[in-house]
Amino acid sequence: MSKKLHIKTWGCQMNEYDSSKMADLLDEYQGYTLTDDATEADVLLLNTCSIREKAQEKVFHQLGRWKTLKDKKPGLIIGVGGCVASQEGKAIKDRAQCVDIIFGPQTLHRLPEMIDQVQRGEKVVIDVSFPEIEKFDRLPEPRADGPTAFVSIMEGCSKYCSFCVVPYTRGEEVSRPQDDIILEIAQLAEQGVREVNLLGQNVNAYRGATHDDQICTFAELLRLVASIDGIDRIRFTTSHPIEFTQDIIDVYEDTPELVSFLHLPVQSGSDRILTQMKRGHMAIEYKSIIRRLRKAREGIQISSDFIIGFPGESAEDFADTMKLIEDVAFDHSFSFIYSARPGTPAADLPDDVSDEEKKQRLAILQDRITQQAMRYSRQMLGTVQRILVEGPSVKNPMELRGRTENNRVVNFEAPHTHIGSFVDVEIVDVYTNSLRGIFIRGEAEMDLRRSLRPADILAKHKQDDVLGVTQFTP
């Protein structure tokens, strides 16, 4: 009888990526297969996020539900990972006696050893250390799951914004070597991946080592990824304005694989609040980046993060944020009411904006951005859009679902043989969260660059030096 693994994931795309790696790791090394049913699992893993309010209590509520499963099945192993585990490991150990393993984002690669330790009789195994980038060296080869894939290029953040826990839970910025990233993406492309999303807490701070002891910048990495045959779209998440340099903007001018959509968090439009947040830039500098981006790539659409009701935020500060939203014409946003994160400098500031005021401001902001997004969507009516077909439509499995470059979901009728490929569709209807399209043509009628398999590229560029050391240059 096969061993079963259940993973519950909260939070960002990095957590989603980490959870997929946990599943691959435990499948390859210990034979665990994933299940959606927690009641049939032999190992339960909770991958946590500490960004939202009351994150710790949310963890304990979930563990309480899992404790009832363990009471019925004493051999069940429960593990807690992610940012809450990194930040609150001792509290979890003290309060949740059902937990066997506590691990941080940088130690998930040690899960097989931790499970072995528990099975040998150790009571609670804890490892929330930051062992540089070691975890990537010990993860199995990537497995594609559809035509899109996340690829982590770096970990941590060194910006220390006053409201943010990431430097304390994931550590400071550490970049993966350039060759490791290129090889992983080439392997994914060979399995049918057409779009990659490069992940990091601050991807534009990427500075990865090369095989000849040089440093690869983020702009250089983007061009290298674009050169991998079969990869026709590149996205990345997320960025910080202070390191969105001109060389990155230049890539938008000459690299069509990089999509015309950018998520660039600003958090506030008030210079006073930006200073309090320790963001390191002013609103005018953010607008300068957007202006240069739109000069390099006409029609690029921008999304952002906003924190509403940061300590000391006045009506004037909020008005500055709304002015920035109007000036930039954001297409989408992730906007949140401020709540203090324990251990951050902002947690020591008086939380002096009332809950009612925060909610009102959030509603105003979200309504404005929804209006702007609908305006962009209506402009797409009658246009032909290139869609990467991701799978069947959620609401109607007989139809197909894909995404435009600007990250809009499109539903349309076409044969399921198009899943995993590009199609052109005409946009005929607009809804709040999706578009409706009519199939125009399939990939066979397009001039897409797929003359070589990634394996051929690797073989062509792989050379052994006189010491027998293999080097790969894309």
Curated annotation (Swiss-Prot):
GO terms for molecular function: 4 iron, 4 sulfur cluster binding; metal ion binding; N6-isopentenyladenosine methylthiotransferase activity. Residues 3-120 form the MTTase N-terminal domain. Keywords: 4Fe-4S, Cytoplasm, Iron, Iron-sulfur, Metal-binding, S-adenosyl-L-methionine, Transferase, tRNA processing. SUPFAM superfamilies: Radical SAM enzymes (SSF102114). The keyword Iron-sulfur applies. Binds 2 [4Fe-4S] clusters. One cluster is coordinated with 3 cysteines and an exchangeable S-adenosyl-L-methionine. Its EC number is 2.8.4.3. [4Fe-4S] cluster 2 binds at residues 157, 161, 164. It comes from the Bacteria. [4Fe-4S] cluster 1 binds at residues 12, 49, 83. The keyword Signal does not apply. Residues 143-375 form the Radical SAM core domain. It is found in: Cytoplasm. Belongs to the methylthiotransferase family. MiaB subfamily. Catalyzes the methylthiolation of N6-(dimethylallyl)adenosine (i(6)A), leading to the formation of 2-methylthio-N6-(dimethylallyl)adenosine (ms(2)i(6)A) at position 37 in tRNAs that read codons beginning with uridine. Monomer. This is tRNA-2-methylthio-N(6)-dimethylallyladenosine synthase. It comes from Shewanella denitrificans (strain OS217 / ATCC BAA-1090 / DSM 15013). The gene is miaB.
